Amino acid sequence: MESSLTFLLLPVGFPGEVLVTLARRAREAMPVPSLWLASTDPLEPPIEAYSWERMQFDAEKVNEHIHSVLYDYVREGIRIIGVVDADGYIPGFNFVFGLASTALGVATVYTRRLKTGGNGLYTERLLKEVLHEAGHLLGLDHCSNRECVMSFSRSVEEVDRKAPLFCSSCKAKLVLKYGSRGQ
């Protein structure tokens, strides 16, 4: 079992004060022992990752950029989740809410499509997508349980439908690999 899981929430393209509360809520929702840190110092997204045709960022390129800038953190085992104040895509998809690059130890969540509705709804959606990408960084695949945070979301309505929690099956996989918070 891995002894310490550390996540750093990184604002990309906006001031990150909202991430402090998000880090606390993510730690509370994570079924395994983990430390969640939040940077309030934003990283600018790489302009070379921006598609002017699509008006979106290439999520793979953004992940690679974060990895190169914060390599020393990743080398120490810290998993980075960039929260990008923009829209993102990967080839073959019109958009993505997030992308985990497990080999890099980096994931990103894209906020543009999560911002419809009130601020409370946005914060809840953001929490769900951060937990979803954290699950991928910890080795979880998509889950067929539509209420599980690891369920794949094709629309913001599907994000709203799932809970900000791991289902019993996904939770068991994490606890088996990383131990439970009660240990």
Swiss-Prot record:
A GO biological process held by the record: proteolysis
Residues of the active site: E133 (proton acceptor)
This protein's record includes keyword Iron: no
Which keywords fit this entry according to its UniProt record? Answer: Hydrolase, Metal-binding, Metalloprotease, Protease, Zinc
Bound how, and how many: what does the cofactor note say? Binds 2 Zn(2+) ions per subunit. One is catalytic, whereas the other seems to have a structural role.
Provide the residue positions that the database annotates as binding Zn(2+) 1. H132, H136, H142
How this chain assembles, per its entry, is: Monomer.
Function, as annotated, reads: Probable zinc metalloprotease whose natural substrate is unknown.
Q: What protein family is recorded?
A: Belongs to the peptidase M54 family.
> What name does the UniProt record give this protein?
Archaemetzincin
Q: What species does this protein belong to? A: Aeropyrum pernix (strain ATCC 700893 / DSM 11879 / JCM 9820 / NBRC 100138 / K1)
Its ancestry begins with: Archaea, Thermoproteota, Thermoprotei, Desulfurococcales, Desulfurococcaceae
